[in-house]
Amino acid sequence: MIFLINIKLSLIIINQNLHGKMIVYKNLNIKKKHKGSVVAIGNFDGLHVGHKKVLKEAKLKAKKNNLKFGLITFEPAPTMFFNKSIKNHRINSLEQKIYFLKKMKLDFLIIINFNKNFSNLSAEEFIRKILFNKLRTKYIYVSRNFKFGKKRLGDIITLKNFEKKYFYKMVIISPHKKKKKIVSSSLIRKIIRQGQLNKVKKLLGRTWSIEGVVVKGDQRGRKIGFPTCNIKLNSYTVPKLGVYSVWVQIDNLKKRGIANIGYRPTFSGKSLLLEVNIFGIKKNLYKKILNISFIKFIRAEKKFKNINQLKDQIKKDIVKAKNNV
């Protein structure tokens, strides 16, 4: 039984009731109780340890001043909006980002639809129209390399220059470093592509994972005795091609598994897929949402001379995966 998981990113459309006490805004109709707050700003893809440092500092400031605390983020990411050729860029989906932010107990999250009109706002227009008019922001937390406004002309100097005019205080959070390297989403994407999952885990503060909805596939894995879930990676960052040990979350059930990322050269495949064999699962998972956590890289992708060679190798991979997870 083979399934095809087609990852559908939840762009802007959020069910607020699914995210506990954190209010998710998909527009700028901000409730009065969230005005005059402490606000962090950024894309926060992956929500890594550096992002968490910014959010923890901002949350502490809010607590000391008896204020609400929230985050302004953008969908899609400005990088993906301006460069349509970038297809595999996300560390996490929007829904995953919301889930992780909820665990950090933010009061609110504002998801700004990054479109042509928004991209044409000058730096001061962004400050005046959003941070001042809509939010009456008291404190703004950003990283040292923060850029904003049309053509990315706004930066921390711009924010500093407008503090008195728009009645806020800017706070800069220094970069978080691991082994003398600045932790960034770009660095994490690079390490994911290299298949160095232990390093990724340290920088994220958790295991890297993707989510997808199960749909029907071509049943090729079933025919050779290894039913798989096939995933089109869509906008997710593509890991190093090859075989991985994984954990798979299905509702409240967590199972071990093995995954292959590549083009299926033995079958002359053309499209990039992530195929996952879930240990001990035989039931129909059609339309189920799966969360797949990558544990360890096992081996590189390989073209086999025949199906029997492939089957023998899969058996060996499964043994290694069970020992690694």
Kindly give the residue locations of the regions a language model identified.
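N-terminal amphipathic/basic-hydrophobic helices that include classical n-h-c signal peptides
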Residues: 1-21
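Short acidic-hydrophobic, aromatic-tinged amphipathic segments that line or gate anion-handling sites
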Residues: 23-29
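Residue-level signal for inorganic ion chemistry
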Residues: 48, 101, 140, 200, ...
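N-terminal Rossmann-like or analogous alpha/beta NTP/dinucleotide-binding catalytic cores
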Residues: 80-144, 148-166
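Glycine-rich, Lys/Arg-enriched anion-binding loops that position phosphate/diphosphate groups
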Residues: 163-260
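Phosphate/ribose-recognition catalytic cores of enzymes acting on nucleotide-derived substrates
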Residues: 215-325
